[in-house]
């Protein structure tokens, strides 16, 4: 197959060498990430049901999850959730196949509850959240189920990817994963709702961290502020392992500490959605786990989209995979790679309208020796785009 693949040199300063760089990551417990995680869990559960009962993944898009914040009264020693967070599941799913009815509501609600239970230990799923499935209904004829014709793009859209991650991007990503990972053994009172904003100016990296604390572990304001100081030191120690640049860390900068009044970031569940913070699918991290205003990005929401033909999901992940593979295989001659893949509705997903690769090279490099290699690599990855489908279903690929 002759695919439309463009490979060109990009003459600009690589992102890590620019004077200023801004990078953000919303942690797994941020309301936008909660919406993404639930949407993807629902899609996985529906996909598994369809595969088990009909041998293929049927049409669905569950990328319209809304998190509507509840009300809580946190306090030192332990507070209360006063009103549960409302979580709306919407989108579309195949709910009838021939004469068979798919139990889509029970599948989707169970998937959402299981996701919350498995990821947020301080959340009482039965009491602290209310889940409502309003997923739209659709049906297919049994003949359609077993139609194995070519898979075609269901939208005209584009995906974007880049590589490699800069030092600042890596630090932001690893900081959140550290705080929501191994740090929990040292400081279990640090909740899951964490946001990290990285700002590099020349050779100084600033990390501003918003971290919800769980109130039941903390007896008073003095202990809270002592724990916050410990957290700052741990974040700094973790970050300096990744860079020789100066790193400055700021934690919960809206806190107030005065003799007459102290205000800290306290929660009952470790999640700000308990107290009025809302979230939506696609409003947070891109598929590489970051928000990168100094890079090209797609605004497409990948979480919850069907993993078979929705190019908004497939092409964003594939573009990042291609970019990373180019950097890995072509070596130190490559400073930066930008990949864009454009679909056309009705066109085979392995034959996009165009796959564009722009390369920033290091120094005086013979571009010709890389151009054909890159073209062949892109051609191969496009030919195998459908390999991503089961990786999504099995949870091997994250999209936020």
Curated annotation (Swiss-Prot):
GO molecular function, one term: magnesium ion binding
Keywords, in A-Z order: ATP-binding, Magnesium, Nucleotide-binding, One-carbon metabolism, Transferase
Superkingdom, taxonomy of origin: Archaea
Top-level EC class as recorded in UniProt: transferase
Binding-site list for ATP: 136-141
UniProt-listed Pfam families: AdoMet_Synthase
Catalyses which reaction(s): L-methionine + ATP + H2O = S-adenosyl-L-methionine + phosphate + diphosphate
InterPro entries associated with the record: AdoMet_synthase_2 (IPR042543), AdoMet_synthase_2_family (IPR027790), AdoMet_synthase_3 (IPR042544), S-AdoMet_synthetase_arc (IPR002795)
EC number: 2.5.1.6
Known cofactor(s): Mg(2+)
Transmembrane region(s): none
Cross-referenced Gene3D superfamilies: 3.30.300.10, S-adenosylmethionine synthetase, C-terminal domain (3.30.300.280), S-adenosylmethionine synthetase, N-terminal domain (3.30.300.340)
Pathway the protein acts in: Amino-acid biosynthesis; S-adenosyl-L-methionine biosynthesis; S-adenosyl-L-methionine from L-methionine: step 1/1
Function: Catalyzes the formation of S-adenosylmethionine from methionine and ATP.
NCBIfam families assigned: PRK04439.1-3 (NF003364), PRK04439.1-5 (NF003366)
Sequence similarity: Belongs to the AdoMet synthase 2 family.
Name of the molecule in the record: S-adenosylmethionine synthase
Species whose genome carries this gene: Thermoplasma volcanium (strain ATCC 51530 / DSM 4299 / JCM 9571 / NBRC 15438 / GSS1)
Taxonomic lineage of the native organism: Archaea, Methanobacteriati, Thermoplasmatota, Thermoplasmata, Thermoplasmatales
Gene name as annotated: mat
